[in-house]
């Protein structure tokens, strides 16, 4: 009888262990695949690990990203430098700084900045980062684009001027922009929304999202919709980009006391509604 009771006790223990393992695995699976920080409604988003990145390593994952823009040196006078890109403490960090580079190409001087571009292009989906913009007039930007000799399609999820010593509204402005260009005809269609915050965007972390479907583009900030437009032009697979640039003809170059800063990105996440359309980044 004692042995039988022991056997029953062992069986019960194993059953509990199996239930515990199953429950634990179920919870783990749910936590492993996050949902977009945005109203979902009836849409079903499928998380894509191949394109997403939590930046948990000690260096940039070069199977996913370039540490530069392969087709552009940066907006003059600021020069993109791979040395200004690093992964540290669970973040991708892009640095902009006041710096002279002795062998810089003509037109590049005074400032260096950073760019990270995906090695794949994707068509449609939900794109999201959690970040803290740079406290500088060297910009922080999250954008998608593709170009060839004929046209350029571009969706700027955000561009932020984190500091402006004479125009205090700039650091509170989140520019959400769309561009479509036919180079051979000199055509450039561009529109934007300037979404305002009560305080500068650099003072807190921001969750920035974009829903891009065949029918529409929708921009989100911290889960709130800030812009929606019909998708008239953006039907080509595009690269994913994070960068920092100096803008001499927009809000102006950094002041003499602005020596740059860091654009810190905690994660980048991508979801598709169906099978994702993923292509090699072959831009030239």
For the regions a language model picked out, list residue spans one by one:
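GH16 jelly-roll
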Residues: 27-284
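Bacterial N-terminal signal peptides that target proteins for export
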Residues: 2-14
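C-terminal motif of bacterial Sec signal peptides marking the signal peptidase cleavage site
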Residues: 23-24
